[in-house]
Amino acid sequence: MKGKFIVIEGLEGAGKSSAHQSVVRVLHELAIQDVVFTREPGGTPLAEKLRHLIKHETEEPVTHKAELLMLYAARIQLVDNVIKPALMQGKWVVGDRHDMSSQAYQGGGRQLDPHFMLTLKETVLGDFEPDLTIYLDIDPIVGLARARGRGELDRIEQMDLDFFHRTRARYLELVKDNPKAVMINAEQSIELVQADIERAVKNWWKSNEK
């Protein structure tokens, strides 16, 4: 039986790491033990090198389109070499970010051309998409305060507040239009967030159980 692909999305400081643990806990309760973890950008040797280029300052400015193309290069390496093979083996994959991140950050935050964004997505990924996307919604002010509390910010995390407001607005549009996505209020206590995530996964499981 083919596995399923669950993705966790959200702004910086939304609590994706904790959400990851909540999803895995539910899967284990459902007797799904063979779970593969991924992160974007990253997850393969080449993708991890691209991650470093994307997230850190370089000797020359990185254009918005170059940034996006590096993200897609890393993504297809991960999808073709890790995610798809795992799914075909019946394993479940839980991912920290996927394509919705690019649509929100580069499409919303960077304000790249929507037609260019859609064409690139369809060319690289085709009809491949997560079975379930869990979006952790948080006010950028709250999220960035949490992120700063963790230490030094990377190149993208250092963007101005307007960038993150645009990114969040695009996330909200994407989730609204995606029947396979659920939104969780990430400004609640960690206990309430975890409970909402576990409930969302269980409800999704029941509605898709065959």
From Swiss-Prot:
UniProtKB keywords: ATP-binding, Kinase, Nucleotide biosynthesis, Nucleotide-binding, Transferase
Signal peptide range in chain numbering: none
EC number, as in UniProt: 2.7.4.9
Stored PROSITE patterns: THYMIDYLATE_KINASE
Keyword Kinase appears in the UniProt entry: yes
GO annotation terms (biological process): dTDP biosynthetic process; dTTP biosynthetic process; dUDP biosynthetic process
Reactions catalysed: dTMP + ATP = dTDP + ADP
Superkingdom assignment: Bacteria
Top EC category: transferase
Record: residues binding ATP: G10, L11, E12, G13, A14, G15, K16, S17
Keyword Kinase: yes
CDD domains recorded: TMPK
GO molecular function: ATP binding; dTMP kinase activity
GO CC annotations, alphabetized: cytosol
Protein family per UniProt: Belongs to the thymidylate kinase family.
NCBIfam families the UniProt entry points to: DTMP_kinase
Function noted in UniProt: Phosphorylation of dTMP to form dTDP in both de novo and salvage pathways of dTTP synthesis.
PANTHER family: THYMIDYLATE KINASE (PTHR10344), UMP-CMP KINASE 2, MITOCHONDRIAL (PTHR10344:SF4)
Name this protein carries in UniProt: Thymidylate kinase
Organism: Haemophilus influenzae (strain PittEE)
Lineage: Bacteria, Pseudomonadati, Pseudomonadota, Gammaproteobacteria, Pasteurellales
